[in-house]
Amino acid sequence: MGLLDAGITKHNVVVTSVDNVLNWARLSSLWPMGFGLACCAIEMMATNASNYDLERFGIFPRSSPRQSDLMIVAGTVTMKMAERVVRLYEQMPEPRYVLSMGSCSNCGGPYWEHGYHVLKGVDRVIPVDVYVPGCPPRPESLIGGLMKVQELIRMEQIGLSRADALKKLAEKSIDPQSVIEQHRQVARA
């Protein structure tokens, strides 16, 4: 799975670029801050439980935006809550990523037409990198979204903009269920 799993045979030297080292360190140690606002937060909590165990992916939840590099917005964002979402986003250090989880944070959900108090997508107030659809999305979907964030980090380069990395990411597809099964098989062995 990792760089050293295959073993280093002769000279014990690994040659790589600065981009690869920085991206490997960032994607192997994501620190998300969950911003749970509705029923999607329950699925986010289930993802952190022992059945799915996000820590095996190097993902350690944080409660402070100053320690986080990923914000997971899960649930219905109201107009009053939008100001707090922006404030928390601004408190996060660079590079920072946002994952929008669920129909409500993606586009307003079932409240989009008649809910005057509901923001019609969190992307209207902060930039979103990855969208996870569903009402509420299953933990496997959230893990798939987190893997998309890791792929986005892997594709970033010093001279490449975030928009270009997002275009590259849109061309790739990841099956989260196969990755979960792969990790379970490794854990059993």
From Swiss-Prot:
InterPro entries according to UniProt: NADH_UbQ_OxRdtase-like_20kDa (IPR006137), NADH_UQ_OxRdtase_20Kd_su (IPR006138)
Binding, [4Fe-4S] cluster: C39, C40, C104, C135
Essential cofactor(s): [4Fe-4S] cluster
Cellular component, GO annotation: plasma membrane; respiratory chain complex I
Membrane topology: Peripheral membrane protein
Coiled coil (residue ranges): none
EC top class named in words: translocase
Protein name: NADH-quinone oxidoreductase subunit B
Organism: Chlorobium limicola (strain DSM 245 / NBRC 103803 / 6330)
Gene responsible for this protein: nuoB
